[in-house]
Design a protein with these regions (language model features):
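Non-catalytic helical/linker scaffolds that mediate oligomerization, partner binding
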Residues: 1-563
Length: 563
């Protein structure tokens, strides 16, 4: 079976690398997430981030109040309206993360070779000799002489002088006496503690996480919950139960794999989660440096085979303080794309970085170049070999057969675009799973789902959630606009032509169900149609919000439009 390293199609010649790119307006297929914070929360900066390529906004509740994050989200909504660009929202939990408590206002200076004690006594003030931590007890954690401990600022890069590596010398009850391995000054918004090989038995959701989900998440109909320090599939079940209890049944769960326990149970986690985040910062503390690439490639491949979108963190840390990445960082970003990553999640670069917008532009540009070299056909064949054959297989349901056929047809005719009509977004995810070389325009058609006396409106959340899927551009259809007659397809092509996704004469693949129009409402066989842009009448010279399709909006917007 093909493996990750074969998904690279080299350029025709080294000289071709020097040629100027022909079309810089086409966005990268790889999705780009940004951690929003002090340097990236104004309307102006958020507008620039959206234009630069941000598709996922991460609100990290490891720090900051609900009021602070609400103000940032309100600004993001204004920025989305102003730019007419969609962006999905992600609530990142604190989980069982350990932090330093009772910090003084002044930074804490530490010297290599000195003794530093970690204590679970929460009444002690943090100082140069002792750090109180938020974990209740060291008993049963596996902490022992020789254990390695890392203490650093929130979203540490590893290159700053505000992090310290400790070696445990002695464990006495709930205190661990350590030796500092390096000199540093501990500072930053929050100090996190990472103990290698620790058995962390704290609840997967902290009390603050429960409040954030039930209040902030429910009020804002958040699209994803990113579950920090996911240890097993049971942890995902816990957060799903909480989401269901507060009316967030449509919210999806992204499992963050960032410790050894999560690595051990990665197979079950990938199967249970809706998507996966490979947190290389924290996982890199638990693994030897020479083993990190193995974990990365295996996890990416597992997610690819399962059809679960996977994002990766910690790519261009240098750009937190510098306007350009290192050559190694640039190569790393490209290799992530070639290894099968669906998205990149930026942390300190956009949270506190001096060059947030430039970072997004740079990473997107690197991703676009890597996508040009991605061997889509070899990747497609590797998935089909995994399922067993090129025809309908027991492992391939109707939707997956339709999705894989659409991607294969697009490759055969060199299509410029795949159009998918969907209610739930499921078919869009399945098409994206096969990583076609062209974009996927997903028309999300709102629908009402009935469960007894409970009615749920589908559409708005599903459209935003599609922003996490590689190559997918979702647009909303007006609920009052009916599908028969193919008019909505004409509008979809008109929009694609307006934004430069297709030109006259381009081939387009359309995936839909002939009876309902939706490709994921399949009580009968779906259809893959091959069309040419010129074959369809363009209903109007310009797309506006008066048309039945538009890129951004909420159900409130739709209701106002129809008044």
């Amino acid at each position: 079976m093909a493996t990750n390293h074969v998904f690279f199609e080299p350029p025709k010649s080294l000289l071709s690398i020097l040629e100027e790119d022909k079309d810089l307006s086409v966005p990268a297929l790889t999705k780009l997430g940004c951690t929003l914070g002090p340097q990236s929360r104004t309307v102006e900066v958020l507008e620039d981030l959206l234009r630069a390529g941000m598709t996922v906004a991460r609100f990290d509740f490891s720090w900051g109040s609900m009021e602070y994050h609400q103000e940032t989200l309100d600004n993001l909504r204004i920025a989305m309206r102003n730019t007419k660009r969609l962006c999905c929202t992600m609530l990142d939990t604190m989980g069982p993360e350990i932090i330093v408590l009772n910090r003084p206002e002044a930074p804490i200076s530490l010297t290599a070779g000195q003794t530093l004690t970690l204590t679970c006594n929460k009444s002690v003030a943090a100082s140069e000799t002792v750090l109180p931590i938020s974990y209740p007890s060291l008993a049963g954690t596996g902490l022992a002489p020789g254990s390695q401990v890392f203490v650093g600022q929130y979203l540490f890069t590893g290159s700053e002088t505000s992090s310290v590596y400790l070696t445990v010398q002695e464990v006495k009850g709930d205190e661990a006496v350590c030796t500092c391995n390096n000199t540093c000054i501990l500072e930053g918004l929050a100090l996190t503690v990472h103990i290698a090989h620790m058995r962390n038995e704290a609840p997967i959701l902290a009390d603050s996480d429960m409040s954030a989900i039930r209040q902030w998440g429910a009020a804002n109909k958040i699209d994803y919950v990113c579950l920090s320090f996911t240890r097993n599939a049971a942890d995902i079940g816990v957060v799903r139960a909480v989401l269901d209890s507060c009316g967030l049944e449509q919210t999806r769960v992204m499992a963050k794999i960032e410790n050894l326990e999560g690595l051990v149970h990665a197979g079950d986690i990938v199967e249970a989660a809706d998507s996966v985040l490979l947190s290389r910062g924290n996982l890199g503390i638990c693994l030897d440096a020479e083993k990190m690439f193995l974990a990365q490639k295996k996890l990416l491949r597992a997610c690819n085979l399962a059809g679960k979108p996977v994002m990766v963190t910690r790519v261009v840390d240098t750009m937190t303080d510098a306007p350009r990445p290192t050559r190694a960082e640039a190569t790393d970003v490209a290799n992530l794309v070639l290894d099968g990553a669906d998205g990149i999640l930026l942390g300190s670069e956009t949270f506190r970085g001096k060059y947030a917008v430039s970072t997004v532009k740079t990473v997107c540009a690197i991703c676009k170049q890597a996508e040009l070299c991605f061997d889509n056909q070899s990747y497609y064949r590797s998935l089909m070999e995994y399922f067993g054959c090129y025809t309908l297989h027991p492992n391939l349901g109707k939707r997956e057969a339709l999705a894989s056929s659409a991607v294969r047809a697009a490759a055969k005719i060199n299509a410029a675009l795949i159009i998918v009509f969907t209610v739930t977004g499921q078919t869009a995810r399945l098409v994206a799973k096969y990583k076609p070389a062209c974009p996927i325009l997903t028309v999300v058609c709102p629908d009402i789902k009935s469960d007894g006396l409970k009615w749920t409106l589908l559409g708005e959340v599903q459209a935003r959630q599609c922003m996490l899927y590689r190559g997918v551009l979702p647009i909303m259809a007006d609920p009052d606009f009916s599908l028969p007659g193919g008019a909505i397809l004409d509008y979809a092509i008109a929009y694609a032509k307006q934004v430069g996704m297709v030109r006259s004469g381009d081939k387009v693949v359309v995936s839909q169900c002939p009876r309902t129009g939706y490709s994921d409402v399949m009580e009968e066989a779906g259809v893959v149609k091959l069309i040419t842009v010129d074959d369809h009448v363009i209903p109007g010279s310009a797309m506006t919000f008066n048309h039945p399709l538009f890129v951004i909006g909420s159900m409130e917007t739709l209701n106002k439009q129809n008044d």
